[in-house]
Swiss-Prot record:
GO terms for molecular function: serine-type endopeptidase inhibitor activity. This is Trypsin inhibitor 5. InterPro entries: Prot_inh_squash, Proteinase_amylase_inhib_sf. Its main location: secreted. It is found in: Secreted. GO terms for cellular component: extracellular region. It comes from Sechium edule (Chayote). The keyword ATP-binding does not apply.
Amino acid sequence: CPRILMKCKLDTDCFPTCTCRPSGFCG
Protein backbone atom coordinates (compact mmCIF):
# COMPACT_ATOMS: atom_id res chain seq x y z
CA CYS A 1 0.00 0.00 0.00
CA PRO A 2 1.51 3.37 -1.04
CA ARG A 3 2.23 5.62 1.94
CA ILE A 4 0.11 8.53 0.69
CA LEU A 5 -2.43 10.29 2.89
CA MET A 6 -5.76 9.97 1.11
CA LYS A 7 -9.15 10.61 2.64
CA CYS A 8 -11.69 7.86 2.03
CA LYS A 9 -15.12 6.54 2.85
CA LEU A 10 -14.72 3.11 1.25
CA ASP A 11 -11.82 0.80 0.46
CA THR A 12 -12.49 1.51 -3.22
CA ASP A 13 -11.51 5.15 -2.64
CA CYS A 14 -7.98 3.92 -1.92
CA PHE A 15 -5.15 2.45 -3.95
CA PRO A 16 -5.17 -1.32 -4.49
CA THR A 17 -3.98 -3.18 -1.37
CA CYS A 18 -5.02 -0.21 0.79
CA THR A 19 -8.04 -0.21 3.06
CA CYS A 20 -10.09 2.66 4.45
CA ARG A 21 -9.21 2.99 8.12
CA PRO A 22 -11.68 4.13 10.81
CA SER A 23 -9.69 7.37 10.93
CA GLY A 24 -11.10 8.21 7.48
CA PHE A 25 -7.77 7.80 5.74
CA CYS A 26 -6.39 5.04 3.53
CA GLY A 27 -3.81 2.74 5.03
